[in-house]
Amino acid sequence: MKLFNPRLIVFIFALLLGVGFSVPSLLETKGPKITLGLDLRGGLNMLLGVQTDEALKNKYLSLASALEYNAKKQNILLKDIKSSLEGISFELLDEDEAKKLDALLLELQGHSQFEIKKEAEFYSVKLTPLEQEELRKNTILQVIGIIRNRLDQFGLAEPVVIQQGREEISVQLPGIKTLEEERRAKDLISKSAHLQMMAVDEEHNKDAMNMTDLEAQKLGSVLLSDAEMGGKILLKAIPILDGEMLTDAKVVYDQNNQPVVSFTLDAQGAKIFGDFSGANVGKRMAIVLDNKVYSAPVIRERIGGGSGQISGNFSVAQASDLAIALRSGAMNAPIQVLEKRIVGPSLGKDSIKTSIIALVGGFILVMGFMALYYSMAGVIACMALVVNLFLIVAVMAIFGATLTLPGMAGIVLTVGIAVDANIIINERIREVLREGEGVVKAIHLGYINASRAIFDSNITSLIASVLLYAYGTGAIKGFALTTGIGILASIITAIIGTQGIYQALLPKLAQTKSLYFWFGVKNKRA
């Protein structure tokens, strides 16, 4: 018999791989490590509400802006263009332009579906109910994607961002320790970063301080807070352009060495920006971010190049966070923090301690039972269990997976699954031995008889783990991940690894006089 065989080589390789990649996580040395989840590491947990009505309003605002710009280009005379949650409305001044207007609306419709109502020269346009529902769903997905993008740029490891309910999002941020980190993360997440260029209503702005929102609305304008000068400023309600045309944002320093955010527009945005500034020299244009006016300079000349700056007495950190928010894209809808909960690191440590005690305690009891009941066969099974644990930790570390409390429960469960596989193998071997067969044949038949049952049960469990991971959320994913890895590891260690050890020991086993020492079988071989 050959001492070394393919199965034993695989087992030794699995052992070396498991130990090698587990050391950084277990001993806190350099190398790939397992990331601890919120429940083990501590951090910030938030429940956010997405105001999808605002997404619909913003959609209609963008549509109204595009309609106004393109109608002017095509010399279609429109009056009183207004936008609200119910859609947009306007008046066509020249009935002869009706066909051109219909063609323009069809062009602006794109892949969406409009409901267009016409009463004489008055038009109203809105999305169909199906399109509105689709917009709300897509808004949730867009907000989730943007939050993940921002948190990645912020430098947080393994944030968990998932939809919860119809219009709510759960955000888990492991590792948030200080109040400053909490504040920055919260501000970065909740910032809509909705950038707009809007014209100042020069005719009525002098009365802005004494004006109500309703009075402004009747004028086709909107009252916003002026962050630069204080008070209020009256702007034309239909924006010139918005942040959808923004391509880049970065922190630069002005002539006073103060941090400001420089932004760049795409080709379409640059053209609209240039056309408007060229046609409105001497008038003011406001840079609006999240419904707050940061500056409203007088246009001195046509502004080409499609770039601008946002200043507002920012700190370097604030300017950096704003640039991240702008680069990652504007949220179609504002979000509101509905619930905030801090998980302290002490709670995480308690969870780790309790879980480790449960895991180690259960592991020792299992190994004790296996060694007492199955003798040396039980010891070999225990070796497989140890390698199984190392493999789980190693694979999670290699892929940078997050370990959660349910994940640790999954590890405990896989220990039971691995034990079950070894028990089936040992019982099949003992059955053949009791029938009077030799050790070599008993081991061979034992593995053949046990393998089918082990594969069937493990593959079924693996399919369940994959489905749980694919369709589950948060804690369920953590449980499914460790269970799935553990199942694959148990197949390698129980079927391949232990059989390799037996094959290496066959010369000794063939000569043994006591089956009890090796397999716990009390009767002796004939």
UniProtKB/Swiss-Prot annotation:
Major subcellular site: membrane
Transmembrane segments: 8-28, 356-376, 379-399, 405-425, 453-473, 478-498
GO molecular function: protein-transporting ATPase activity
Record localization: Cell inner membrane
One GO cellular component term noted in the UniProt record for this chain: plasma membrane
Any one GO biological process: protein targeting
Membrane topology, record value: Multi-pass membrane protein
Cited InterPro entries: Acrflvin-R (IPR001036), SecD (IPR005791), SecD/SecF_arch_bac (IPR022813), SecD_1st (IPR048631), SecD_SecF_C (IPR048634), SecD_SecF_C_bact (IPR055344), SecDF_P1_head (IPR054384)
Keywords (A to Z) from UniProt: Cell inner membrane, Cell membrane, Membrane, Protein transport, Translocation, Transmembrane, Transmembrane helix, Transport
Family to which this protein belongs: Belongs to the SecD/SecF family. SecD subfamily.
Function recorded in the entry: Part of the Sec protein translocase complex. Interacts with the SecYEG preprotein conducting channel. SecDF uses the proton motive force (PMF) to complete protein translocation after the ATP-dependent function of SecA.
Subunit structure: Forms a complex with SecF. Part of the essential Sec protein translocation apparatus which comprises SecA, SecYEG and auxiliary proteins SecDF-YajC and YidC.
Protein name: Protein translocase subunit SecD
Organism: Helicobacter pylori (strain J99 / ATCC 700824) (Campylobacter pylori J99)
Gene: secD
